[in-house]
């Protein structure tokens, strides 16, 4: 029996992070967590590229373009969608989630969903580095694990 697993050793990997400017109080913290996670696991600082987009709805397009470039072993999408008075947040979250998943499936490059969806700003702050950890850091470790797993699968 063969068991395939990724590792948390990021040396040699090239990672792109795509970050939403909307709710930047939160997304800046997610970005800090993602960069910290990548660096702590051996990804070289000069192998990390960052692209900014207006909002979470725009994440999939830029993730797709970066994945198609063949320059990256994984892409991390970071955003924060917070419930408002209307259902707008549901549409944004659904489009971002579906679009980011399609990037991975269409390009074969892991695109990690680091978009937090919360009911309020307090929950978002908790998920961006306080009580609930930092989802950006978690996305970084998932990116490394998926990139190294695919390298092993590809032989």
Curated annotation (Swiss-Prot):
SUPFAM superfamilies found in the cross-reference section: Lumazine synthase
GO molecular function: 6,7-dimethyl-8-ribityllumazine synthase activity
Keywords: Riboflavin biosynthesis, Transferase
Residues the entry annotates as binding (2S)-2-hydroxy-3-oxobutyl phosphate: 85-86, 127
Reaction it catalyzes: (2S)-2-hydroxy-3-oxobutyl phosphate + 5-amino-6-(D-ribitylamino)uracil = 6,7-dimethyl-8-(1-D-ribityl)lumazine + phosphate + 2 H2O + H(+)
Protein task: Catalyzes the formation of 6,7-dimethyl-8-ribityllumazine by condensation of 5-amino-6-(D-ribitylamino)uracil with 3,4-dihydroxy-2-butanone 4-phosphate. This is the penultimate step in the biosynthesis of riboflavin.
Protein name: 6,7-dimethyl-8-ribityllumazine synthase
Gene name as annotated: ribH
